[in-house]
């Protein structure tokens, strides 16, 4: 008969406070050491769900099993329970009355004295015991959240069936091999092998059928769990999209409000004012036709200041050609070179005429009797251009 979760649970349910009960069930558990992982899982569930007194009995059973394992150098149960012993024992300690706490501490002291578990596990347990005095009962569940308990039981059950089926299959293979090797032996011996082979084969068949049924149920349950999780995932994705839409709308509204504020302050439509701004900055300053700056030539840097009087120390009443100060270099301006030379010639001609008029008598008649210049004299004097 295959070992099932119900079989293990029923065996644990018969546990009582007598030494015979604790020792007897411990021997039965040790016999099924190849199912150590599954039996430990069922023990953890029973510890979590039991009353305070039953929790203490289950811890006594664990103590008996791990101590026998240490003496007999069997590692299956110690290895199977080590990942859970801190949380499970500490949670049981936190949930029981003070009188039972004292007895659990006694079991813990035995583990420390005999080094049943590693030093790290024992130190962690000691710390959890100290914290439990202040924090009370924890929310620990031995095999995950409580809502996962049905799936965990199915997995444990399937694992038990699979191990039982594998174990009986090994027996069937060995018996069948022996049966083939002893074909020439006595018929009575062959009949004995045949009976054993039939019995083992039927047991193996039942184990595999139970395993297949349990695994199919587990797959159906997991598929249902996956569908439920997919539905929750879809709802969460829709909620995320809704939140992102709200955030996007808020950002757009803030952007619109900021643009409206800039427009009201005169900084809104920059494209409409860009042309005007460019025209105003690039247009030259307007000048009046009568302004002195309208046609003023540009002056080089060596020209005197407008407020200073140039050449003051060299000014004489009747300057002659010898004592004239040298002319400043011609300034670049709107006049051409030809116009500058004509202006200079007229200035020199005017100075020569003034000197000649000073040398003549005041009442001399330079034009004859009628004191009117002739066209020849005017032409000779340079008043007209060449005809």
Swiss-Prot record:
GO terms for molecular function: molecular condensate scaffold activity; RNA polymerase II C-terminal domain binding; RNA polymerase II complex binding. Residues 298-323 have a biased composition (Polar residues). It holds the Pfam family CID. GO terms for biological process: mRNA 3'-end processing. The modification Phosphoserine is found at residue 372. Keywords: Coiled coil, Phosphoprotein. Residues 283-297, 370-379 have a biased composition (Low complexity). Residues 177-255 form a coiled coil. Residues 353-365 have a biased composition (Acidic residues). Residues 257-387 are annotated as: Disordered. Residues 1-133 form the CID domain. GO terms for cellular component: cytosol; Mei2 nuclear dot complex; nucleus. Belongs to the UPF0400 (RTT103) family. PANTHER family: CID DOMAIN-CONTAINING PROTEIN-RELATED, CYCLIN-DEPENDENT KINASE INHIBITOR-RELATED PROTEIN. This is UPF0400 protein C337.03.
